[in-house]
Amino acid sequence: TDSPVIFNSIYTAEHYDAQKELAGWDSPGFNATGWYHAQETESPTETIKSQVMYPIRETARYTATQCKKINDSCYVYHFPQNIAGVTELKVKGKKGTKLRLKHGELLDKNGMVNMANIDYHYRPTDDSDPFQTDIVILSGKQDRFMPKFNYKGFQFVEVSSSTPIQLSDENLIAVEM
């Protein structure tokens, strides 16, 4: 079974296709017929040691102080402070609609996210993995997305949609890590 997580990179972002979600897959009683079972494998080294570092955990949540509508398919969210973290998106939209959540610390003169101060050394080979930009494909139902494999530095989030969509300050929350 394909995962809804279709790409992840700790340095850039996560791409998520909500159309591939399987309700209850992580709960007891889920019918996993056709799934492969976990298999025991050899250790990659003789001694396995845990990482000696503090865990990355949620420490605070922030609601947007402003959700500025740029046009029918683009919004810019302003959060009260610059954080290291992720955003939690809760939205319902047309099935197959692609949202891009571009996280940054600055705005340009037009009020759009400017990443000139943080993507200085980023050299992509194509447009498939934009820097600090989560990509979410909507299922047509009520969708919830929060990245599990990365975090970003940001105070502003530019949400652009492949089709017109209605968003408000309640659709996106900043989660500090």
Describe the predicted segments one by one.
Residues T1-M177:
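Extracellular/oxidizing-compartment recognition motifs
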